[in-house]
Amino acid sequence: MQDTKTTALEPEAIALVAADGCPIRGFAWRHGERHAGDCGVMHESNAGVRPVVIVNAATSVRCRYYFRFAAFLFSHGYDAIVYDYRGIGESRPRSRSLRGFSASWLDWGQLDFEAVLQYAAREFPGQPVDVVAHSVGGVVVGLAPSNEMIRRVVMMGAQYAHWRDYAPGRKLVMLWRWHVLMPVLAILAGYVPARRLGWMEDTPKGVALSWSYSKARFEDTFRRGAFALSEAERVRLVAQFSAVHAPILAISVTDDEFGTVPAIERLLRYFTGSALTHLRIAPRQIGQPAIGHFAFFHSRFEDSLWPIALAWLKSGALREGGPGSVVFQRAGSSTHC
C-alpha cells in the first residue's frame, strides 16, 4: 500500500560513539540554522525553544521504519532523532556479518540509548528531551544512566517478552518461534538470520537470547550467561528504572499479541518514579480492522493514533475525546511538567 500521508522530509544522517567505542548511527530532523558556539561547537539557533523527541525502536526494527512518524513530529514543531541499536540497520558492523557480534538488551539501553541522550543534550542544548518508545524501546528507557533528563515518554506496546504474557490464543506459536527456534538459530549460526525468515532484521545472538530467556522479573534474565550480572548489579539495574520521573503514557492495542495488559503492566511496575497512564485501544474504535504490534507507526494512522502521542508530548495529558480507555493510572513523583 502506498503511503499518501506525511512526507518523510530528508533528515540529516548522524553518527556517534557509545562509551565502549561502538559506533551508533541514525538520523535527525532539525529546525533552524546551526551556528558555532564556544570552542567551535555547533548548536541550534533556536535552542531551548522546542523539545527534541528520541524514538526508541522495537527489537530488530530499523530506525527507517519510524521516518514518517518522525517527520510528523517535525511538522508539528519538534526536532526528532531516530537511531539504530548496535547490530541493527545503520549501526550494523561494516563487515555486515553478525556472527560473533556482541550485543544485548542491556547494551542497547546502557550504552546506545545513553549515547543518544548525551548527543541530544549536547546538540540540542537547553531543549527538553522526550521519548517515544516502541516495544523493547520502553525497556531501553529504564536502562540509560542519564534517563532522569527525559521530560515525557510515550510507549507503544512496550514490554520485555516474558512468555507467560503472550496473547492466550497465540502463546504456543510464539513460544515455538521466539523461545525454541530463535535461540537454537542464535546458538547454531552465531546470530539470528531473521531477514531470510521474514521475521525482522538479522539479530545479534545476545539480543536474541535476552529475549528468548526473559524471566518474569527483567533483572533475573541476566542471572547467568554471557551477560550475567552480579546481585548488586541487578539491584542497580532495577534502581535505574526508578530514576525516570517523566510521566509515561503506555499505549496498547487489543490485537497486539505481545502487548497484552499483563505484559504492559509488568514493565510499568519498574517505573516507580513516574506518573503512569495505560491507554488501551481496540481497532474498531478508530474504524480499522487491525493495528497489531507494529502498525501504530504506519502513516495510515496519522489522523487517528498519532495525535494521541502528540497530545501527550505537548501537555503530558491524554487527547480529549480520543479513542481507547484507561485501564491503569497511577500518580507519580514526576518533577517534569
List each language-model region with its residue ranges.
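Alpha/beta-hydrolase-fold enzymes
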Residues: 132, 136-224
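Alpha/beta-hydrolase active-site loop
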Residues: 102-123
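Short alpha-helix in the alpha/beta-hydrolase fold that links the catalytic acid
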Residues: 246, 259-270
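Short beta-strand/loop motif that positions the catalytic acidic residue
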Residues: 244, 250-252
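N-terminal cap/lid segment of alpha/beta-hydrolase-fold proteins
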Residues: 1-43
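Catalytic active-site module of serine/aspartate enzymes centered on a nucleophile-bearing elbow/loop
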Residues: 277-337
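Conserved alpha/beta-hydrolase
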Residues: 63-96
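Active-site glycine-rich loops that stabilize anionic/oxyanionic intermediates
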Residues: 50, 55-61
